[in-house]
Amino acid sequence: MQPNKPLVVALMGPTASGKTELAIDIAKKINSNIHNIDSRQIYIDMDIGTAKPTAVQQSQVNHFLIDICLPSKPINLHDFQSIAKTSIERDLEKKGLTLLVGGSGLYLQALIGGLNPPAVPPQKFLRDQLKKIDKAERHKLLKLCDPFSAQRIHPEDSIRIIRALEVFYATGRMFSKAKNMRPTPWRVLELGLNPENLTSRIQLRTREMYKKGLVEETGDLINKYGNNLQLLKTIGYGEARSMINGKINYEEALEITIKRTCQLAKRQKTWFRNKHNSKWLNDENALPEALASIYEFLG
């Protein structure tokens, strides 16, 4: 299939909605590659806790933007946008279409919504000072500087909170307002997946993560990158680390992870509803509906 004009199909939806499996099925049918737009699957050594496509799944369809950087060297939105656009444009030149998959709304908007994030380099001294502040106080500070970003960013997400404050202090502008919009050079078809049984899917997937070795993977990350790795504060890894450190037991870790994941899914659904104009797919007929939309879009 070689459409006349480049087409980007973006499959979005909350965590645990089944995007990975559906994306692979779609990609096989339309002979496309997949670009990962998940803010944590870009990191090496973070597999189980991010629900990264397995080696078998990745062997079925080419996946890009997975395992592109070390957890000890996190990248910001501007850096990701630059890397991702280069990869996507290269793929479009060869195939004429590609498939983006992810639940990270801001990352998706940076690629398909024309978002142009501020190119503010890391401010080491400022970051060091902000890291000394208690995370609750840090989030309160963000509320004062940038209420919209504070509402969108979870209080536990230290990386994004520090980045938003960094942009504010470096430019004098709110991170949420410092993003100019520019048109995307591609045709874009947005498809959404939001199954009715999402809560039970989250519960099942979280239990599977722990059974597959989330705690062991977290221990390996601690041994390799240190106990203070910022990404170890994210969902799943934060609870597993607390369990390793003897602060909570297995059942508590499981329960908190499920709760935090459900909260994330709620925020993701709100974002997609407010920021995107997706065609939402029926869970039972997602594949044929997706293919029909793609073929109709291609004409």
UniProtKB/Swiss-Prot annotation:
Its cofactor is Mg(2+). It is an enzyme of class 2 (transferase). ATP binds at residues 13-20. The keyword ATP-binding applies. GO terms for molecular function: ATP binding; tRNA dimethylallyltransferase activity. Keywords: ATP-binding, Magnesium, Nucleotide-binding, Transferase, tRNA processing. Belongs to the IPP transferase family. This is tRNA dimethylallyltransferase. The lineage of its organism: Bacteria, Bacillati, Cyanobacteriota, Cyanophyceae, Synechococcales.
